[in-house]
């Protein structure tokens, strides 16, 4: 019975920590550039695009495809950075918990 109470207490503490971590992640931002800094993308912690900067030299009709590729590359890099930061925070929160390999938390 004591073990069950201890597990319930741990679960409640984990829930509070997860909420705090989710709030912290929501305020995070990740930025990445491509094309030597010609395009910069910033994503919020929720994964939404919050800023896009494009060097005016790319605003030429014959360079549309290059611009599109640079935006996609910068976005993908920013997303990878954001996911890495989220994974790091999640790992620090769940350290020491008996979570099965491959189990994904719901956030």
From Swiss-Prot:
Keyword flag DNA-binding: yes
Cellular compartment(s): Cytoplasm, Nucleoid
Positions of transmembrane segments: none
Entry GO CC: bacterial nucleoid; cytosol
Gene3D superfamilies, A to Z: Nucleoid-associated protein YbaB-like domain
Record's keyword annotation contains Cytoplasm: yes
Pfam short name (any one): YbaB_DNA_bd
SUPFAM superfamilies named in the record: YbaB-like
GO terms for MF: DNA binding
Keywords associated with the record: Cytoplasm, DNA-binding
HAMAP family: DNA_YbaB_EbfC
Task performed by this protein: Binds to DNA and alters its conformation. May be involved in regulation of gene expression, nucleoid organization and DNA protection.
Subunit-level organization: Homodimer.
Membership in a protein family: Belongs to the YbaB/EbfC family.
PANTHER family tied to this protein: NUCLEOID-ASSOCIATED PROTEIN YBAB (PTHR33449:SF1)
Name recorded for this polypeptide: Nucleoid-associated protein BCAN_A0034
């Amino acid at each position: 019975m004591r073990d069950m109470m201890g597990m319930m207490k741990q679960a409640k503490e984990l829930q509070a920590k997860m909420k705090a971590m989710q709030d912290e992640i929501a305020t995070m931002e990740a930025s990445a550039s491509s094309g030597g800094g010609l395009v910069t993308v910033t994503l919020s912690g929720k994964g939404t695009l919050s800023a896009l900067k494009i060097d005016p030299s790319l605003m030429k009709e014959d360079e549309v495809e290059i611009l599109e590729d640079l935006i996609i590359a910068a976005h993908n890099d920013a997303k990878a950075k954001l996911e890495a930061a989220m994974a790091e925070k999640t790992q620090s929160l769940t350290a020491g918990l008996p979570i099965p390999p491959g189990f994904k938390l719901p956030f």
